[in-house]
Structures are given as structure tokens and as C-alpha cells.
Amino acid sequence: MKVHETRSHAHMSGDEQKGNLRKHKAEGKLPESEQSQKKAKPENDDGRSVNGAGDAASEYNEFCKAVEENLSIDQIKEVLEINGQDCSAPEETLLAQCQDLLFYGALAKCPLCGGTLICDNEKRFVCGGEISEWCSCVFSTKDPPRKEEPVKIPDSVMNSAISDLIKKHQDPKSRPKRELGSADKPFVGMMISLMGRLTRTHQYWKKKIERNGGKVSNTVQGVTCLVVSPAERERGGTSKMVEAMEQGLPVVSEAWLIDSVEKHEAQPLEAYDVVSDLSVEGKGIPWDKQDPSEEAIESFSAELKMYGKRGVYMDTKLQERGGKIFEKDGLLYNCAFSICDLGKGRNEYCIMQLVTVPDSNLNMYFKRGKVGDDPNAEERLEEWEDEEAAIKEFARLFEEIAGNEFEPWEREKKIQKKPHKFFPIDMDDGIEVRSGALGLRQLGIASAHCKLDSFVANFIKVLCGQEIYNYALMELGLDPPDLPMGMLTDIHLKRCEEVLLEFVEKVKTTKETGQKAEAMWADFSSRWFSLMHSTRPMRLHDVNELADHAASAFETVRDINTASRLIGDMRGDTLDDPLSDRYKKLGCKISVVDKESEDYKMVVKYLETTYEPVKVSDVEYGVSVQNVFAVESDAIPSLDDIKKLPNKVLLWCGSRSSNLLRHIYKGFLPAVCSLPVPGYMFGRAIVCSDAAAEAARYGFTAVDRPEGFLVLAVASLGEEVTEFTSPPEDTKTLEDKKIGVKGLGRKKTEESEHFMWRDDIKVPCGRLVPSEHKDSPLEYNEYAVYDPKQTSIRFLVEVKYEEKGTEIVDVEPE
């Protein structure tokens, strides 16, 4: 066996690295600087020490000094063991644990998982156990539960010089209560201003900031700092940002808010500055330490390194020598793994491949590292002369990484998640769209040789280009360059769906609150982002985040997987008209609607009448129609078929551009789950609206990508329509009976302006006016049907979003 390349010989966790740094310390007595509690005693507002009430703090410091000077490390371990405490921590931590135990009493087990509690940097007690096999425990408190029983003292300590001092604190009734330094409210006294499209809504951050002692201002006058999305600087910023810079106010990223809340204290503003240094590229900063928008820029520009199950990992360079994934007895020796443990802050991936190269031995490639921290990843490429030995080593590594056997997984997908072990990402045999679709340069050549109508060719060019899929995955944080999230097996997608549905039901029925509820959400988030490998996983907290970052993300990944399979590999010779070829595979007829026709005028009128500007921060975006396409698809009921059904309405459907190909190719799919939020409120339904404004919010992606598409579809609501002004408690009945549903919003279209199209299809086109349902969770009316055969896509409306109050000038490239 020959080792060709090794970038890092050992991949160690943070705990392991700390352990190595401590190896030089002498056993037994520890350095005073690391043994003793800090002597500085911060004070509360009333002047009391936060480490204890009154003299208790001083007494505790003297007690700690006595324990440190008189007990050996062996005696310390004996005290901890006899009182049922964990002794696996580093020695300096064991001393602090022992001092706390002897003075304040033995810690009880974690109320969430039964694990062991330890004091974390004198700020709060945290748990070292696991909630489940997916997630480490997230329990933390300043007032830990303690055993209401006398401390057990081993004989060796009873015979020590400080036995009388220790006995004094044995009785639970005589113990003072330990109070730790307060860091609960990091924003006390701060006025913070928000700007731009952050990963969480401004309303979310307003509540979070106020809950943590701060206030939010709509202006920058007198504020502590301005929190922005770094995307704002790329577009030149707004007057608000310019004003802040002119006043010398700190302009920081959203990560400052996130880290300050998580660490319970305000972080240094200068470390999160986004205007004095506009580029992090080349700094080698791990993505989890960057602002989400900065990470997105790097991940978006990174090339996909493995396109699917047969993809040789790009960094091996073996594909340049004709390398192919080794296959034997029906097994492909190419595995990808992910682990996301939000309790420990882990987000890592692993790649294992056996690669055959012409006129060479078998090659084994192994890579493991933190997401976005490529320079520090463990990576090796080894050449094996013995094929059987290489196969055995591959299987051994698989079991080491995943805690399961390779062959049962590869043949039958049998696997059981093990604590602290990776979980396989089940790649499919195909080419992910980020690799197989056409790049910008190739698109120009392909379009020039396309035999389709020029407008249709440009539309197909959008669907077959990498850009819309790259951006969609990037916005969701599901675009890791190492793993092909757009080429997953149906089994893996089904597993994701089952995990999501199981958790949705748990959310609906749970009575948990406080830290137990937080643990439940952390466990799901870790599980979800292990299956849906992300560049920026987050701990989800509520149903709105569940809808945005799980349900909607799943639907997008599912649809992109469909696009990957249809588009395939277009990287070859573009002179063979690949756009026409993919158009034929779609099984549909798409034609541009004449701008002088009645249909075109009807569509434009419907859009303009029911549209309201999309608002991002303090900027509003209007919309203009570029083209209207008529659609006839083999997968969708024809207009003649749909006209045979009752109660037909022409409605708007919002969609990302990345989801369009699937809609045309396969038809609409119902929502993946039922949640009490718009879009999911009526369960597993196909949801539309009579307001173009509602659809436009789904179609709008970002200010620097103003193009989008809205869908107009005919929906048959059936003979019976049920109206709701609040989320229905039971959506299962609606799904089973396939009853048409109308959700009444706070705004409605003026009914006197409605008209009919194609004889008996209602077009609810009218000015948006306030409705009598002022407390509805819906802003606009929503309509839901449960059978895809009740919907028929009629038009795709190509639109352009434009900032209101500005003049748009097209500039030719130099």
C-alpha cells in the first residue's frame, strides 16, 4: 500500500485537541492558575457578589484554596466517584467539580437526559449527556438540581487535614445556594437597528433583542450598532447604511446577534464588522465562523466536487486519469456521510471512495472535516495492490465512521444511527444539476443553435441552466461542494419526509415547555441537518422556521432532484441542440402568448390588479410582465378535462424558478405536511391564491436576481367548499374527503370586478380591499385542493422585480 497524499494525519475533536495540550501537566498537584476558582468577584446591581450571598463567596474561595492545597488528584477522583459524579474530565476540571460538590452538595442528574452536569466557565451548568443518538444534550442552567442528601466522604479524605472543614458542609440544610455570574441579557442598555434580508425576520430579532435586554430602533440615530445582511453592501447599501457609516457607527453581521444570544454575553462588535473589510475570500475562515451571507458567497462560488454515486471526488485528480468508482458484485464503493450535532456544535462530512484507474492499482480516497473548513480536513489518497485488502479496509472504515456494516447498508439500506457517529447520505446514480446543467457560457452557445422559438428557447435555457438551482440551494444552505444534495435516492428523500412528518405530529401533540421543548427542537434540528446536509445548520424554534427551513427546503430539494434526472449531463457538445432535446423530454408544449391577444391582456390585468409591492426591509419592489407562456403538459389535466369539473377558478401559484421544471414535468404535488402557517395551513394540499401579491412573495428571491416566474392554474374546488378564518384543527379529514377549501385573508379581491374566462372559469380579479376577517393569520385569500387532477397549469408569467422609485437602466457589458 502506498500513501500518495496526506493533508492531515489525524482529525481530532476539540476535546481531544485540548487533551493533548494538557499532556505536559504534572499528575497530582495542578498549577494554581488552572486549579483555583477565579478570585475576582463580579457584582450584581445591588453590590452583592454573584458567586454567593454576602460572606458565602469569600468563604467559598477560602474553602477552594484549602481543598486545592490538601487533596491529591486521586482523592479528588475518589470524592467524585463515591458521590456518583463523572470523573472523565481533564484534571483541572475535576478539581473545580470537587470543590463545588464538597461546598454546595453533589449535583443531581440532568433532568432532560439523566446525564452528568458540569460547570461551564463559571457561567452556567451544562450537561454532557445525549438527548438521542442524533443530538447531545442542550440542558443548561444557573441553578442546577442537587442531591438532597449528605455528601459522601471517603476514608482517605476523612483522615486529611481538612476533614473538619469538609464535614461542616455535609448537611444539605447548612449549604448556601451557589449563584453564578449573570450573563442572561447580553443587550442590556443597547439600542440596535436592523436592515436588509436577514436569515431570521426582523420581527423575530426584535422579540429576541427585547427579551435579552435591548431595544430596536427603525433609525440609526443613537444606536449601538446597525445589523445588516452583507448582501446590502454588494448592492451599494441603502441610505440607512451610508448614514451609519458616516456617523462612525459599527455595522455588523447577523452573526453578532446569534453568537451574543448563544454565549449569553455581547460579543466584540469589531469581530463582526462587515464594511471595513469587504472580503473574507482567501482568509481560510471556516464557514461556521462567517456570517451566513459571506458563507453563501463562498459556497456558491465553490465547484461541486462529487456529482453523484459514480462521481470521482474532484480533489483526487483521478478523474483526469480516467478514474472510475470501483464496482464489484453490484456494489459501488463510494460513500458520503454527514453529522450535525447542534448540542456539541458539530457539522461535519466524510467521503470514502475506491477508484479504479487504467494501468494502475486500486486507489482509496478518504476525507473527513468540518463543513467549510477545507484546509484543516483530514485527507488521504492511498494506492492498494491487494484488491481484497482494500475492500476489507473500506468496510472497516465504514463501520468506524457510521457504526454499522457496509454491505447491509449498500444492498438493503439497513442502518441504525449510533451516538456520535456519522449517517450516510444516500447518493443516487446520476449527475447532480449543479454539475450536469449548463453554465452561462455554454448556455449562450446552446441557445444560438436551438431550433425552438427564441422565447421558448430562452425559457428552457433558464430551466436547464445551473444558476437557478445553485441559487436555490445556496439560499437554503443546502449547497455543500462536497456532497450532491441534488442527486439523492428516493429512499433518502422518503427518510427525510418521514422524519419531518413524525416531528410535525410531535409538535402538534407535545405539552413540553422550557428546556424540554428546546431539547425536542434541538434533537429534530440535529437529525434534520444530518439528513439534509447543510452549510449552515440552525436550531429551529417554531413552526414558522419549521416551514421555511425544513418543509419548504425539502420540497425544493425534492424538485431539484427531479430536475437533475431530467437534465442529466449537458456538459458535452452543445451543437447537438441539447435544449430541444430536454424540451422533448419534458413532454409538454410551451408557446409564447401574443402580447396583443385577449389572454395576454387578461393575465396582465389580473397581475396588476391583485399585486402589492414585495417589501424587503425599507425597500419596496414592483413587478413588470416580460412574457407570458401557455402550457400544455402530458402530466397535467388539459383545459378540456378540467372544464368538465365544477367550480373552476383561475388562481396564482407561487414557485421558485428551481421548482418549475418539476411542476411542468410531473404536475403539482401537495404540500409535504400540515402546519399552522400560510402555505401549509390546510394540510397536504395544493395551495393557490387570488392575489398575485401572495404568489410574488414566493417567486421573489433576491434583489440582485430580479427575474422570476408566477404560475396561473385552473383549480376545480368541487361542489362543496369549506371556508376557514383560522387553521383547521383536523386537516386529515379534508385530505381524505378531498374537500375544496378557501382560507379567508385580511384582504380580499373586490368581488364586483370578477369576471369569467373561457365561458365558465372564474377569474377573481379585483382591487385588493380589507376584508371583515381582520384577525385572520392569512394576509390574502388561499384556496386548497387535495387532488392534483383538480389543477391544470395554464400560464407561466415571466416577471421582473424592480425597486420602486428608481429608474432601471440596462447597461451593455464593456
From Swiss-Prot:
Chain intervals for the UniProt region annotation (Disordered): 1-52
Residue span of region Zinc ribbon: 105-150
Broad EC category: transferase
Compartments, as annotated in UniProt: Nucleus
Primary localization class, coarse: nucleus
Annotated SUPFAM superfamilies: ADP-ribosylation, BRCT domain, Domain of poly(ADP-ribose) polymerase, WGR domain-like
Boundaries of every BRCT domain copy: 187-274
EC identifiers of the protein: 2.4.2.-
Start and end residues of each PARP catalytic domain: 577-808
Ranges for domain PARP alpha-helical: 449-568
Reactions it catalyzes: L-aspartyl-[protein] + NAD(+) = 4-O-(ADP-D-ribosyl)-L-aspartyl-[protein] + nicotinamide; L-glutamyl-[protein] + NAD(+) = 5-O-(ADP-D-ribosyl)-L-glutamyl-[protein] + nicotinamide
Cysteines engaged in disulfide bonds, as pairs: none
Record-annotated PADR1 zinc-binding domain positions: 38-186
Any one GO BP annotation for this protein: double-strand break repair
Pfam families: BRCT, PADR1_N, PARP, PARP_reg, WGR, Zn_ribbon_PADR1
Biased composition (Basic and acidic residues): 1-19, 27-48
Domain of life: Eukaryota
Gene Ontology MF terms: NAD+ poly-ADP-ribosyltransferase activity; NAD+-protein-aspartate ADP-ribosyltransferase activity; NAD+-protein-glutamate ADP-ribosyltransferase activity; nucleotidyltransferase activity; zinc ion binding
Record has NAD as a keyword: yes
TPR repeats: from-to residues: 182-215, 277-310
Cellular component terms per the entry's GO annotation: nucleolus
Similarity section: Belongs to the ARTD/PARP family.
Function: Involved in the base excision repair (BER) pathway, by catalyzing the poly(ADP-ribosyl)ation of a limited number of acceptor proteins involved in chromatin architecture and in DNA metabolism. This modification follows DNA damages and appears as an obligatory step in a detection/signaling pathway leading to the reparation of DNA strand breaks.
PANTHER family registered for this protein in UniProt: DNA LIGASE, PROTEIN ADP-RIBOSYLTRANSFERASE PARP3
Designated name of the protein: Protein ADP-ribosyltransferase PARP3
Source species of the chain: Arabidopsis thaliana
